[in-house]
Structure formats: C-alpha cells, structure tokens
C-alpha cells in the first residue's frame, strides 16, 4: 500500500477535496462535457470489498511501527499462501454483494472505468518483504533482467504477456473475472504491478483518474488520484471494508472520494511533492520493498527529500534514470554511483545536522547508521516498472458496458448471470428476484433514459419524471438537484419485480379517487433519483415534466381564485355549544336570541263581565316568555306559562289592614304621606258621628268607643280616599271590598235610622 505518511503530508492541501462521488461526476461532466474515465486498482478494490482478509497479523507486526499497513497482496506470505491459503482470502457472498454494489454505482452514473489486475511479472521481493533475510538478493536482480527480456520478446511476438500467464488463477480471482465477463465489463491484466499500469494509462491520456489508496501511484508518477472511495464523510485513509471504527462519521447512502490533483498541490506547495521528492522520500522511509534507512524517520526523510541545495532527489534520479539491458557495464556503474551517493548523504547530514534537523543527533551519526538501503533492483522497479509497452485500446471500445454511450447492456444474458449469482448463495437478501431486478435496472436506467428520443414515443411509457428535489449531503454542505425517475421493467429476460404496484380498491367503502402520486406508482412501480445535470434539458421527458408542472400550477391558480364561503372565527369554546345547542362557527351574538315570536299580553280580564267599565283599571304590561324551547313547533297547542309584570305588589295578597299599612309606604301615594288610612267601616262611622253628635248616653257611649279606637289617627276626607283607592288599585278583590263597604254603609245607615226612631 505504499507509504501512508505521504497522505499525511498532503492532508493540509486537501481540505476541501473530500466530495461525494456524484458531485465529482457532475463537475467533470460540466467542465469536460463528457463522462470521466477511471482506471481502478482491482486488487485494492477486492481487498476493500472483503475478498482478502484473515491476514497473519503476527507476521505483519514484525515490521517497524512506523511502517505503513500493507495490503494482503503485499504481505510476507508467498503467492500460494496469499491466494490459496484459507486464512488469506475469502469468496463469501458478502464480498460479492459489495463488489456488485460498487459496479452498480459507477454504471448508474454512466462513468467509464477499467479494472486493472496485477500480472505474473509482479516483483517477487514484494512477497518476501518481511522475511528475515534481505528483501532483495542477486537472484532478484537476475529475475528482474530476465523478466524484462522475456517481457520484451512476448510483446514482440504476441503483443502481450500471455505466454507468461500462470496456468491457473486463484479461486476468488477466477470468480471475479467470470462475473465481469458475464456482465460484459472489460478489464486489463497488467504485466507487472497493477498500480504501475494504472499510472501508465493516466499519464498516456487513456484515462483521466486513478482510483486507488496506494501511495505508490504517486511514486510511479501518477498525478490525478481518487483516494478512499467509501461511505465516510471524512478521509481516514485506506482500510478494509470490514473494519469498524466508532469515531468515523458514516453515511450509508452516499459514497465519497478524495480528489488529489498533484500539479495543483505543487503550485501551492512550491513543487515540494513532485515525483522525484516522493520517490526519494519512500526509499528513505521504507515502502513495499525495504524497511527504510536506519535512523531516519518521516520528518527527517521529508527534509532530505525536499532539500534544494544540494538537491538529493535529483542526484538520486540521475543514478537510476537510464536503463539498458544490453549494456551490462552500466549496471555495475550504477551500483558504484549508488554507494557513493549513500556515503555523501551520510557525511552531509553529519556536518549539517543542526541546519537540516534543528539539532545534533549523535546517535543518528554514529557508526552503523544509515544502513538498510534498498537494492538497485528494487529501486529500478519504481523508475522502470514492467508495464505493457503497447496498450491494446480494444478494452476501451464501446462494445463493453463499462464504456459510456452504448446500448449493449440489452444484449446481456441476464438468465445466465442470475443463475451464476444464485449459485453463490448471497446472504442478507430476502428476495433474490427483487434484488436482481432492481440492481440490473438501476445500473442502466440513466443510459436507457438518455437513449429515448421523439421517435420512441417518449419511452413507450416505460419511464417518466415525477418529482424533483435537492439532495442535501453532509448536513447541507453539498446540494445536488435530482429528478425522480419512475420506471417499469425495460430489460429483457428479467422477471418483473415481486413488488406489486398499488391497485385501486373495488371496495364500496372507498370514496376517494387515487392521488396523482398513487397513479404514478400504479403505472411505474420502480423509482430512482438521478442528478439533473446528467440529463440534458432538451430531453423529451424533461420537457414533458415541466409542461405537466405548468398545467398543475394553472389548475391550482384557478382553484385559488374561487371565493370560498367566509366563516367567522370561533369566539367561544364548546361549553357554549353544549349549553345552547348551537354550532360554534355561528355568530356568538345570535346564540342567545330566541326564534320564538313574543306573545302579546292578554287584554281580556278574567272573572269580569264584559259590560263592566274598566276605564279606571291599569292595563298590565306586556308579557314575555320565561322558557322557550327552540325545538318546539309553532303549531304546538301545549299550555304556555307566562309571568304578569306589574309595577307593584298586588293587593290580592294582603288583608285590608295590611293593605292600608302597605299603602302608607307606597312611593306613588304623595298626598298626606303621614296620614294612615282607615277601613271604610271606621271611616263611615267617623263621618256619621261628626254629623250627628251624641245627645244621649247610648250615643255618647258609641261615640266614645269609636273615638277611643281612632285615637291618635287623623282621618282623610271621605270624598278623597275611596275614589283614589279605586283608581289606583282597581282589581277583582278591590271590587269585592267596595261591595262589602257598600253593604256595611247600608247597615250603618239602617242602624242610624233605628237609633233615631228609638230616640
């Protein structure tokens, strides 16, 4: 996996380089007007997907703590152990699902990609790195030069390295390649290291970026790298997909990449991270092929690699830049120059320790320091890696589905692909048919959508745009406008998804018609969000969508112009509603009003003859209902009780004596208020006594008796009291009292006549 410290030193220049994969594709399409083309380090992908795991940790732990964590393919185990040992790799269904998921994401965005596998000419010393013996020997030197000779001959005869291919591939490699063949995805088998071949493709212009976590891609001369393809917001460096760190911010829906543009970084950093500096830094610190120079850590190694006067990186490059198989003397000369360079570097560090490192390091400069330099063969693999000298561009032709702008995906044998995947017993899939249907359609939905034109009658109804929205990623840091594409099955020989679309119910209880969204789901049960910028605005379905939205907006505006019934706001709670039996939306001011007509007072007096004069009687005040039932009918003949409203208490409720006392307190009696009225009988007797003074003893006794009873009482004139009582308090009882008074008066008169006769 190269030197991880390189990523550490580049991190300050990569602050805003961690972006979603979809944004990277969109930005590239905007700037270049085409899809990006990416070379993928296949072994790195297989490691991250989980094909290679259960590594012998004890062997790796023997390396220095500062040494980077290496890929399983670069571990200490030999080829058979790495590929065939039960502890070094796996072909579990989970790894296959992860691999297919990555392929699906690239294909769904219409990205062009090319998988690059390691070849049989991969340096053998990488597999023997952690052996106790020296990593590179004379045998390695012979192997390197013989491999180069055989490599050149094979390309002259066959045009490739097929003559050097191993008789059989490891199991998981065979499985992956068979899957790629069934899906018609092209790939490249490099002659040597896959990273070196990826760099060759990028430098030659065949691809735009390299997708890899291996820093060796920079050492080989790569300039544009996509690093740490994962579902993490933050760039934590390369790791296996099986690792679980609680500190990592995980996003299960979106994939991110870290975009590294080395020329832009060097413009800011002053060319401190060019290829020569990074290569010399890797040699000093230690990489896949050596343990590093003793006594130098990452900071001291970086100081020496970036030193400009003297420029040790350029001197180191001059030693290994030339390569000639026919001139064997050049190799011995190279070794001699290499030893002199090591000695010169040691002496310079000893003399300028404070200037270079800020202090004097006696331990560093002791005898025995600066040991552990790699062999010339190991360094030659970085300066002159074994790659294909003549690249076959057929793998980039549009007959493969991993190249954009072709419709060959319709010709895939989906039945054979389905049976192959079913034989792997993929885990965590509840419905294989649905998973297979959705995965295949999501891979090629964008291509199928872009292939639609007017002659297709707008996709023959297979798909349509139903919604649009802005996808917020990383808390709104990235916003990607997307269209929601609803579609039906459009690939041949693929069973329809088991997800049944919504159907309109025939139940009589259903009163509402389906909504527009429900109708869309019934017609197109599957959906996928695609970035708007990957779809041209002139596309027929895009035009149809915006026309439909305009019609919907006009309908809403028409409905909004219709005047709705104005309703008064509720001004009371439901207590008033329960008490008055009225709706709360009605006007509160009308709640207490009665809908019954006010009854007129009864003008006919009860128990009085019709011929009697009632001119002196008061007409009672109008009566009003005391209890009105709003739910009663107007034609109801039931008895209605009313209250008679009078100005004062009726005289019917008191005796004549009490009535006299009450009358004295009445405010309406304003004549002689201090005079207490007497009964008519007493009044009559008093009058007669005044007219006829007693002359005899009987008459005197009668007069004394009357006077004694009326002592201290002032009498009113008889001609004023009686009419006043009749006028002001004329009622039934008053009439009876008047009749009684007349009767008493007659008896008094008779009594007076009898007294006169006796006398």
Swiss-Prot record:
It is an enzyme of class 3 (hydrolase). The gene is YEN1. This is Holliday junction resolvase YEN1. Residues 62-83, 498-518, 683-702 are annotated as: Disordered. It comes from Saccharomyces cerevisiae (strain ATCC 204508 / S288c). One of its GO terms (biological process) is replication fork processing. It is found in: Cytoplasm; Nucleus. Its EC number is 3.1.-.-. InterPro entries: 5-3_exonuclease_C_sf (IPR036279), PIN-like_dom_sf (IPR029060), XPG-I_dom (IPR006086), XPG/Rad2 (IPR006084), XPG_DNA_repair_N (IPR006085), Yen1_H3TH (IPR037316).
